[in-house]
Amino acid sequence: MAEKITIARPYANAVFELAQAQKNYDQWSRVLNVFADLARDSEMQILIDDPRYTSEQLIGLFVEIGGDTVTESAKNFIKILADNRRLSVLPEVAALFEQLRAEIEGTLEVEIISAKPLAEEQLNEIASALKRRLGREVTFSRKTDESLLGGVIIRAGDLVIDGSAIGKLNQLAASLLH
């Protein structure tokens, strides 16, 4: 959804600059993830999209549900989003914030999807190769998807490496059709 990302980018940049100035990336990561989870909730989405709910009511909900994680700066941030009817972009703001944070910290979150769970040795080899190629430390999230048949799919930011058996079969089928 390019439109939401476009809308979210200036907010993410502003929060990131504030987090840099305050030197509290962890606090902002926590609060943005709480807010993003709230904005993803189907019942909360109905309230966010309902024009009958005022920005003050929505701010109150986010602050109350956010609890102790909500600082005064975070409350002001939610107020800006609510006043501009932009609470629905919170998941994108959180994701962009984490990308900016990873960039500044020299890390990259990598998603590895494999047909079967990978051994530590295999993960270390993948990590080493990605570190050489991308020049950054990598952290993993792992998923298994038996429909891949074999191999792995690696997602690192905008980079997608499809080394799955099903991916190779799809490439072969596409080349035979053309």
Swiss-Prot record:
Assembly information from the UniProt record: F-type ATPases have 2 components, F(1) - the catalytic core - and F(0) - the membrane proton channel. F(1) has five subunits: alpha(3), beta(3), gamma(1), delta(1), epsilon(1). F(0) has three main subunits: a(1), b(2) and c(10-14). The alpha and beta chains form an alternating ring which encloses part of the gamma chain. F(1) is attached to F(0) by a central stalk formed by the gamma and epsilon chains, while a peripheral stalk is formed by the delta and b chains.
Keyword Cell membrane in record: yes
GO cellular component terms, A-Z: plasma membrane; proton-transporting ATP synthase complex
Subcellular location: Cell inner membrane
Matches recorded under Pfam families: OSCP
Protein name: ATP synthase subunit delta
UniProtKB keywords: ATP synthesis, Cell inner membrane, Cell membrane, CF(1), Hydrogen ion transport, Ion transport, Membrane, Transport
Molecular functions (GO terms): proton-transporting ATP synthase activity, rotational mechanism
Function: F(1)F(0) ATP synthase produces ATP from ADP in the presence of a proton or sodium gradient. F-type ATPases consist of two structural domains, F(1) containing the extramembraneous catalytic core and F(0) containing the membrane proton channel, linked together by a central stalk and a peripheral stalk. During catalysis, ATP synthesis in the catalytic domain of F(1) is coupled via a rotary mechanism of the central stalk subunits to proton translocation.
Family: Belongs to the ATPase delta chain family.
InterPro entries, per the entry: ATP_synth_OSCP/delta_N_sf, ATPase_OSCP/d_CS, ATPase_OSCP/dsu
Membrane topology: Peripheral membrane protein
Main location: membrane
